[in-house]
């Protein structure tokens, strides 16, 4: 790897091999240089793995690495979790054919661009895309997503070596809103902590960071940091259709505090004659606590977005970063599906729409189940949008 984050010392495109890659490093990889990456540490449920899927980079994470890999010809099979070295002619032909079949499937799916995302009985679903930044927008548009259901704003912080200013954030949010041309853009406020670390914030190392000082807890503890981001988002809302969602909510008190800070930000902007749009406020449902009081939370916000990755981790008491637990980490667990159903029911009782923005939203084996539960929106990796649309149109 090069001296700068995300750079690769090679003229030719390569398969990048590393002991580990942090989300902040992954998001800066140059896709023209990195065909794929393989790491020894990590888990397929980590944010690094999720980013690889968002960026459409084949990856193997948490695998044994043979020695002396540099310069070798290799095949990365992300579907089967295989690293194949010095493949014979038969294996090469097999993967060439597989690649051609995949390209053919992509071409067929392109016929669904411009079509409604609705079931055979006419039930419409809002099908949005998850992004980490501006670089993902081309894929969102190419795959005809109806909007952005999750803009992971933390990558503005992870990609920088200092705190992004209000102006820097405003320019990015405004550009995304304008590019989406009136389509919904839901920005998740700063969600760092756990495996997403920002050195310049000087956060203390924790024994159990997934349950520690992270996400909304940081924002409410450091209101000026929070207000800077909120000001930037509200200013950008004048130029498009923006919603805001807040991560890691566990109580009504948090929402009330958030609303107080939002009111202060809006008052400040008004006092300075700065225009802003009508912004929908929602929360992530990613803790069992939020699920259990979702009837009360629904009275306070306009939408829920279910983060199935963390909801699975916290419900099953299972570290999503630990590769030894991958076979036990089961988002299909009946407890998870019951929690999703409960959240939908409680949301709808109070006219609160409900979506899923976790990886489970793109699980085609559950699409019909989610529709029967009454899910209003699915937000998925851009490359999965047309596949999910195809599945929904056959239900």
Map each language-model feature to its residues:
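Low-complexity, highly charged intrinsically disordered N-terminal segments
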Residues: 1-5
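Glycine/charge-rich, flexible interdomain linkers and switch-proximal surface loops
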Residues: 6-28, 274-284, 291, 364
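Acidic, glycine-rich flexible loop/linker segments
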Residues: 8-13, 18-143
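Conserved alpha/beta-domain cores
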Residues: 106-395
């Amino acid at each position: 790897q090069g001296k700068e984050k995300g750079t690769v010392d090679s003229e030719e495109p390569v398969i990048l091999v590393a002991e580990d890659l942090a989300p902040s490093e992954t998001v800066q990889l140059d896709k023209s240089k990195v065909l794929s990456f393989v790491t020894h540490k990590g888990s397929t449920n980590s944010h690094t793995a999720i980013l690889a899927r968002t960026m459409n980079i084949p990856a193997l994470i948490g695998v044994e690495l043979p020695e002396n890999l540099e310069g070798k010809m290799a095949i990365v099979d992300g579907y089967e979790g295989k690293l194949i070295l010095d493949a014979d002619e038969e294996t090469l032909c097999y993967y060439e054919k597989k690649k051609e079949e995949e390209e053919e499937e992509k071409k067929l799916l392109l016929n669904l661009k411009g079509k409604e995302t609705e079931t055979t009985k006419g039930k419409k679903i809002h099908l949005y895309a998850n992004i980490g930044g501006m670089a993902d927008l081309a894929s969102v548009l190419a795959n005809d997503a109806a909007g952005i259901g999750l803009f992971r704003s933390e990558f503005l912080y992870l990609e920088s070596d200092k705190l992004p200013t209000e102006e820097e954030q405003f320019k990015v949010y405004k550009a995304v809103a304008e590019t989406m041309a009136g389509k919904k853009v839901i920005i998740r406020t700063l969600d760092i902590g756990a495996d997403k670390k920002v050195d310049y914030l000087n956060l203390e190392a924790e024994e159990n960071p997934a349950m520690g000082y992270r996400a909304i807890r940081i924002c409410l503890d450091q209101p000026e940091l929070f207000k800077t981001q909120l000001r930037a988002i509200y200013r950008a809302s004048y130029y498009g259709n923006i919603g805001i969602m807040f991560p890691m909510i566990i109580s009504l008190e948090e929402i009330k505090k958030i609303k107080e800070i939002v009111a202060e930000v809006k008052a400040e902007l008004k006092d300075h004659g700065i225009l802003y749009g009508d912004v929908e406020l929602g929360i992530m449902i990613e803790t069992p606590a939020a699920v259990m009081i979702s009837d009360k939370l629904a009275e306070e916000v306009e939408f829920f977005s279910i983060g199935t990755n963390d909801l699975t981790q916290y419900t099953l008491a299972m570290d999503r970063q630990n590769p030894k637990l991958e076979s036990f980490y089961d988002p299909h667990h009946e407890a998870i599906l019951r929690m999703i159903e409960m959240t939908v029911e409680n949301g709808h009782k109070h006219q609160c729409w409900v979506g899923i923005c976790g990886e489970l939203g793109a699980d085609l084996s559950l699409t019909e189940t989610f529709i029967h539960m009454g899910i209003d929106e699915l937000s998925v990796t851009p490359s999965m949008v047309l596949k999910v649309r195809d599945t929904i149109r056959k239900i």
